[in-house]
Design a protein with these regions (language model features):
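Glycine-rich phosphate-binding active-site loops on the catalytic face of alpha/beta enzymes
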Residues: 11-32, 70-80, 117-137, 164-177, ...
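Catalytic cores of alpha/beta
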Residues: 6-17, 54-64, 104-123, 151-162, ...
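N-terminal active-site wall of soluble small-molecule enzyme domains
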Residues: 1-49, 57-60, 86-89, 168-240
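Active-site beta-loop-alpha junctions enriched in small/polar residues
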Residues: 4-5, 27, 53-55, 74-76, ...
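C-terminal helical cap(s) of enzyme catalytic domains, especially alpha/beta-barrels
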Residues: 83-93, 115, 127-146, 181-191, ...
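Active-site/ligand-binding-proximal alpha/beta "capping" segment
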Residues: 63-144, 272-275, 279, 283-301, ...
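Internal catalytic-core helix/loop-beta-alpha segment
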Residues: 248-289
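Hydrophobic faces of well-ordered beta-strands that scaffold small-molecule active sites
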Residues: 1-2, 22-24, 48-50, 69-71, ...
Length: 357
């Protein structure tokens, strides 16, 4: 029960309505009031999240025997957010206590930033304001990652269950992962929890790629020879597609052109970039050190990603990852290995930028 609890009747009501835990804020309670309310909660077997906002309150919480410390990043006077507060106050907390970061938890990058010193996160409107809370939770915890080359409803369901947000449907007859429009419709109907991306090497007729509930079209055509021609291709796709469908551009980072330079040039023309090795789907990676910093937060990193190198890929700090052949059964293009998916996303979930100290 997350409320400004100041009276024990609120705890009785919380338990009556099925609460497992309550929030006690030291900013509004004296030590005596906290102890009395904590005793009532403990009598019901409720966990207590003790909220603190500074060093003094953290010391009070420990003195009062709090085991779950909630660090509120929000200044309750001016509502500003200080995300560094968790790191400062977690350093005062013993290792056997649980630290929960509160307020300002808006994306996976924030979760990874705070994960080195926080054991959990308290998130409210960032999730409840979304039309699909399950998908929003996946994006918050794992990031906007994509599993491409889905060939069946089972593969899509495994991708969503593992933590993916996007599912890639390849509409390209030359690809071993090509799907028909009928198969695509079956996949989308069976797993509506993914946002689907149509992937194609075509340079015209983008409207033909439209299927129900499509989130984006990923242009995987070869390099068009110049930045101007690339922009014309992207503009042509936008002209054919509804405003609700994003336009992504795959950029080969190992081609004849400078992939990093091209990605930078196209940054403002696309909704997202996909940085890949060659034509994609080859199971090979490229030199990630050549990715310009300026494009990373609008790019999905692709090319040879698998459970063994996911942590290294996350360290590149792109917006998200694009997995394909590295989470398939060997020699079976399009048949996703649910075990490999789970291992990859387990690494994504637990990845953070620093150890708690």
């Amino acid at each position: 029960c997350k409320d400004f609890i100041i009276d024990e009747v609120q705890i009785h009501a919380a338990r009556y309505f099925g609460a497992d835990a309550i929030l006690l804020m030291l900013s509004v309670l004296s030590d005596e009031e906290y102890a009395a309310l904590a005793a009532v909660a403990e009598g019901y077997g409720l966990d207590i999240l003790t909220e603190v906002i500074d060093e003094e309150e953290t010391e009070r919480a420990l003195r009062l025997g709090a085991k779950i410390i909630g660090v509120n990043h929000r200044n309750l006077h001016d509502l500003s957010i200080d995300l560094d507060r968790s790191a400062r106050l977690a350093a005062l907390v013993p290792d056997d206590a649980v630290v929960v970061s509160e307020s300002g938890i808006r994306d996976a990058a924030t979760v990874r930033r705070l994960g080195g010193h926080s054991n959990g996160f308290l998130v409210g409107s960032q999730l409840t304001s979304q039309p699909d809370i399950d998908r929003a939770a996946r994006e918050l915890v794992y990031g906007p990652n994509k599993v491409c080359g889905l060939g069946s409803a089972n593969a899509a369901q495994a991708a969503a269950a593992a933590g993916a947000v996007y599912g890639g449907l390849i509409f390209e007859e030359a690809s071993p992962r090509n799907v028909s429009r009928e198969t695509a419709a079956e996949i989308i109907a069976a797993e509506p929890g993914l946002q689907y991306v149509a992937v194609s090497r075509r340079t015209s007729g983008f409207r033909e790629l439209l299927v129900d509930d499509l989130a984006a079209v990923q242009i995987h055509a070869p390099y068009q020879g110049s930045v101007e021609a690339e922009r014309a291709l992207i503009a042509a796709a936008r002209a054919e597609l509804p405003d609700t469908v994003e336009v992504w551009r795959a950029v080969s980072m190992t081609g004849l052109q400078d992939g990093g330079e091209l990605a930078t040039d196209l940054l403002e023309d696309v909704d997202k970039l996909v940085l890949d090795a060659g034509d994609g789907g080859t199971g090979t990676s490229f030199d990630w050190s050549g990715i310009p910093d300026v494009v990373k937060q609008k790019s999905l990193l692709a090319g040879g990603l698998n459970p063994a190198n996911i942590a290294d890929a996350l360290a590149v700090d792109c917006l998200g990852l694009d997995l394909n052949s590295g989470v398939e059964y060997p020699g079976q293009p399009g048949r996703k290995d649910s075990g490999a998916l789970r291992r990859a996303f387990a690494t994504i979930r637990t990845y953070h930028h620093q150890d708690r100290s």
